[in-house]
Structure formats: structure tokens, C-alpha cells
């Protein structure tokens, strides 16, 4: 996805996208660890900066690490932020970041919005989640938002048709899940437990897009 027009495209594809960044930041800001003044927070897969803009607005005291493997996305995020906030920019993956000196156990919270769904379940999802857990202080939380497989197979056809209809009504030729790798709640629970988190607590859902709070175990 090109950075130009990325936010508009996401709002056409994802129900409730306009509220995702605001809700994600508000949830993390209400957590015990990240509520502390000057907390260090990781935005893993920051894209064009939606969560960064919300974080600098809601919590200007936070020290943010904006992480994305795409130089183009980071450049667009930097343009949108325009020098706001206390930010460190990193063109990298979370798996590489956590191995750098001083990164393990550094962060009081993390955000990962619409990232895990792009990783295949061939060890890549587990590696990503494990690296996030290692980046966090014990007891710190991760807000994870992702496209999920439905837990109600009898409604799968209706939900998919509704998603296609939502996109058409938003002025977009309906897209498919090609290139995405959604998993179900049972598989997500297994992966996050193996990575070092407790069970996921669902806090948001719009059709197949679901948001969870995950707490790093001590």
C-alpha cells in the first residue's frame, strides 16, 4: 500500500477505522504502567502515523518509539507529525529492535494496529508477538487490533458479504483478504500465551476487525 492516500483507503476498507487510533491510545493510556508520566511507549508498525498523532494529542508526555520497516511510511508519518511529540523514529522490525542494547523490558506499553494480520502463521506471528513481549516491562500491556477469523462459522458468509457491501458503499471496489493471514481467537490465544502474554481480552469489534488488550506476564 502506498503511503499517499493510505488513511483514506483504510477508512474505506475498515469499519470504525476513524476511531481505532483514538480508542487504542485511550485504552493504553488507562493502563497502570502507561499511565505514568513520561512513560515510554512503542508503536509497532506505525504506518503513516495515525496512532502517533493520537498519542501526542492525548499524552504529550509520552516518549514514543515509532517503528516501521517501510521508509516511505515513516517519511509520511514524519510529515504528518510535523515535529510534534517526543518521538524516536526507527526503520526496523520489532524482532530486530528488541535485540538492540537496552531494548528488552524497556517499554511501559505498546500499540500494534493492523500489523499481525499481514504476517503468515509460519512462525512469523509468534516471532513478532514474542519480540513485543520482550520489549515490554512485566505487567505492561499491548493493544492489538487485527482482522480475525469469525468464531461463528454459520455467519461467515453474511459477515463477508457485509464487509464487501461496506466497502462498496464507501466508494471502493470491494477487496478480498488476499495477502492477509487472519487467525481465530483460539489460535491467537495460543500464540500470545507462547509469546509471554496472558489471555487476550477483546475490547473492540467491527465485523471481522477486533481489538484486544494483552498483558505481559511477569
Where are these regions (language model features)?
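Short conserved loop adjoining the S-adenosyl-L-methionine
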Residues: 96-104
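A conserved beta-strand element that flanks and buttresses the S-adenosyl-L-methionine
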Residues: 111
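Core SAM-dependent methyltransferase catalytic element
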Residues: 195-218
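C-terminal alpha-helical "lid/dimerization" subdomain adjacent to the S-adenosyl-L-methionine
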Residues: 145-195, 201
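Class I SAM-dependent methyltransferase SAM/SAH-binding core
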Residues: 40-44, 48-97
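Conserved class I S-adenosyl-L-methionine
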Residues: 1-35
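A short glycine-rich, Lys/Arg-flanked "PGG" loop and its adjoining helix->strand segment in the class I
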Residues: 126-138
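Short catalytic micro-motifs in class I SAM-dependent methyltransferases
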Residues: 114-118
Amino acid at each position: 500500500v502506498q503511503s499517499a492516500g493510505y488513511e483514506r483507503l483504510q477508512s474505506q476498507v475498515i469499519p470504525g477505522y476513524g476511531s481505532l487510533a483514538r480508542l487504542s491510545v485511550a485504552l493504553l493510556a488507562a493502563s497502570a504502567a502507561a499511565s505514568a508520566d513520561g512513560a515510554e511507549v512503542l508503536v509497532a508498525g506505525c504506518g503513516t502515523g495515525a496512532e502517533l498523532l493520537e498519542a501526542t494529542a492525548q499524552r504529550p508526555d509520552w516518549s514514543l518509539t515509532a517503528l516501521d520497516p517501510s521508509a516511505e511510511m515513516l517519511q509520511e508519518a514524519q510529515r504528518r507529525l510535523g515535529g510534534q511529540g517526543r518521538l524516536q523514529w526507527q526503520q526496523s522490525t520489532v524482532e530486530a529492535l528488541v535485540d538492540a542494547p537496552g531494548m528488552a523490558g524497556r517499554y511501559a506499553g505498546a500499540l500494534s494496529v493492523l500489523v499481525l494480520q499481514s504476517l503468515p502463521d509460519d512462525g512469523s506471528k509468534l516471532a513478532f508477538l514474542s519480540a513485543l513481549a520482550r520489549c515490554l516491562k512485566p505487567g505492561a500491556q499491548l493493544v492489538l487490533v487485527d482482522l480475525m477469523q469469525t468464531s461463528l462459522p454459520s455467519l461467515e458468509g453474511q459477515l463477508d458479504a457485509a464487509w464487501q457491501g461496506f466497502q462498496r458503499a464507501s466508494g471502493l471496489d470491494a477487496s478480498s483478504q488476499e495477502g492477509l493471514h487472519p487467525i481465530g481467537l483460539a489460535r491467537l490465544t495460543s500464540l500470545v500465551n507462547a509469546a509471554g502474554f496472558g489471555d487476550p481480552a477483546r475490547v473492540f469489534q467491527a465485523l471481522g476487525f477486533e481489538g484486544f488488550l494483552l498483558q505481559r506476564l511477569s
